[in-house]
Amino acid sequence: MSVKKKLLAELRQKSLVELDAFIHENKKALFSLRAEAALQNKAVKTHLFSMYKKTIARSMTVKQEKEGKVDG
C-alpha cells in the first residue's frame, strides 16, 4: 500500500475532533517551516512545503467527506 493510501485510510478512521487537531498541527508545522525559510536560520528542506500542503488538503477533504459536504 502506498504512503498516500495509508494516510487516507488513517485519516478516515479519525473523528472530526481528531481531524481538526491533525489539520491544526500540520498548519503550525507549515507556518514554522515558512518562518525558518524567511529567517534563513537553517537549511530548509523545501520538499516539506508541498508535503505539508498536500497532507492538509487530504485531511480537509476527508473532514468534508465526513460532514457530507463533498460532491461526487
Swiss-Prot record:
- Cellular-component GO terms for this entry: ribonucleoprotein complex; ribosome
Q: Which UniProt keywords apply?
A: Ribonucleoprotein, Ribosomal protein
Work out whether the entry's keyword set contains Ribonucleoprotein.
yes
GO BP: translation
- Keyword Ribonucleoprotein appears in the UniProt entry: yes
InterPro entries recorded? Ribosomal_uL29, Ribosomal_uL29_sf
- Which GO terms label this protein's molecular function in UniProt? structural constituent of ribosome
The record, for NCBIfam families, names: L29
Q: Which HAMAP family match?
A: Ribosomal_uL29
Q: Which family does it belong to?
A: Belongs to the universal ribosomal protein uL29 family.
Q: What is the name listed in the Swiss-Prot or TrEMBL entry for this protein?
A: Large ribosomal subunit protein uL29
Source organism? Chlamydia abortus (strain DSM 27085 / S26/3)
